[in-house]
């Protein structure tokens, strides 16, 4: 059994290892520690420092690494674990992987709906910041003698961000303070004490009209409107289109997120505006939305992103072309084959290989990997 190629996946902590052997049992397994009953090559891989789990299905492995582990160290060890290591993709030894590549997960720690701490997690770093003391004080006021604080704390997913983690923290802090202004804290405390149950998850949705939004001059209020906006419909497009021109990046980003919820090809022109935004975070978010929608009609616009100055945006473009592209995109892919970012270069090589081999897009495989049992 040999390794045919190594491919990146949407997660910076997971690599796909394509094998020359296909499982005949059509089953899948997840391995997390060395055990005698497991295949020898699986145990060899799990013995590599930094590898945390392996998912084996069909003819490939999804290899997960620890967030602080480096692919540039792990990949040669993966090759060496197979008998014919010299046939593995030799180029993986050459480029240097940037540990700061990819997504930064943003989370907000709350107690009974009252926020008091932000956590950011990147591929190799975790950063936390407590909100101003008044938030902690109000959180304390919401406690009762019978509350199990540890059990009742909740991490709210704020979505992914991109860029320098310290700068991202500044931006997320600004967003949180705008979404939960100090003036709202007494209301949250009152609600928490009135409800007084362990599953309290105070959040409300409120639809606003274009006129009301347009008449709002405070950007923090505009952001709050978007954060509390229900799932949008076609009738909300004028409002969201207006928000795309906002001077504040968090507002534009949230407008893109909401537009991406309208699952229709008619929304693509508005997402294209996001691809041209001056903020790389907004451009990447727009690319993520287009990727989630999966409309091949977006290929010409995504091809243009291969020239984006930010590698997080170029990577998303190459990934989309891999998922949806065809022979028409080969010239553009080959023109960018020497991208100086390891992840982008590998993704471009993978897209070229898939298209030239006539293989179908692997969207269903990514879905299977995402839904696998951990």
Curated annotation (Swiss-Prot):
Disulfide bonds: none annotated. Keywords: Virulence. Signal peptide: none annotated. Pfam families: HEAT_2, Nfu_N, Virulence_fact. One of its GO terms (molecular function) is oxidoreductase activity. It comes from the Bacteria. Required for hemolysin production. Belongs to the CvfC family. This is Conserved virulence factor C. It comes from Staphylococcus aureus (strain Mu50 / ATCC 700699). The gene is cvfC.
């Amino acid at each position: 059994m040999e390794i045919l190629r190594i491919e990146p996946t949407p997660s910076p902590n997971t690599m796909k290892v394509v094998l020359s052997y296909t499982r005949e049992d059509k089953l899948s397994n997840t391995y997390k520690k060395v055990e005698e009953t497991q295949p020898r090559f699986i145990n060899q891989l799990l013995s590599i420092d930094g590898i945390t789990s392996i998912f084996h299905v069909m003819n490939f492995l999804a290899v997960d690494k620890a967030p602080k582990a480096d692919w540039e160290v792990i990949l040669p060890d993966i090759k060496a674990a197979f008998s014919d290591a010299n046939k593995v993709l030799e180029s993986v030894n050459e480029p240097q992987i940037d540990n700061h590549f990819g997504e930064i997960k943003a989370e907000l720690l709350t107690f009974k709906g009252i926020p008091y701490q932000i956590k950011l997690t990147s591929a190799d770093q975790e950063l936390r910041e407590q909100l101003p003391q008044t938030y902690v004080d109000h959180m304390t006021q919401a406690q009762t003698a019978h509350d199990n604080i540890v059990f009742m704390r909740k991490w709210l997913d704020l979505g992914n961000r991109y860029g320098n983690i310290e700068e991202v923290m500044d931006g997320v802090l600004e967003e949180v303070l705008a979404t939960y202004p100090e003036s709202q804290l007494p209301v949250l405390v009152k609600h928490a004490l009135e409800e007084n149950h362990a599953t309290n998850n105070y959040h409300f949705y409120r639809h606003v009209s274009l006129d009301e939004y347009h008449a709002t001059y405070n950007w923090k209020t505009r952001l709050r409107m978007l954060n509390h906006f229900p799932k949008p419909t076609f009738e909300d497009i004028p409002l969201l289109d207006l928000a795309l021109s906002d001077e504040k990046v968090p507002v534009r980003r949230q407008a893109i997120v909401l537009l991406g919820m309208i699952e229709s090809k008619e929304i693509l022109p508005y997402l294209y505006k996001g691809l041209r935004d001056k903020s790389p975070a907004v451009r990447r978010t727009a690319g993520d939305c287009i990727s989630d929608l999966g409309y091949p009609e977006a290929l010409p616009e995504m091809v243009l992103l291969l020239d984006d100055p930010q590698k997080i945006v170029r990577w998303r473009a190459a990934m989309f072309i891999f998922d949806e592209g065809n022979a028409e995109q080969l010239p553009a892919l080959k023109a960018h084959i020497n991208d100086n970012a390891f992840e982008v270069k590998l993704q471009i090589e993978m897209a070229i290989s898939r298209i030239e081999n006539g293989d179908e897009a692997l969207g269903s495989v990514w879905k299977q990997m995402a839904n696998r049992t951990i």
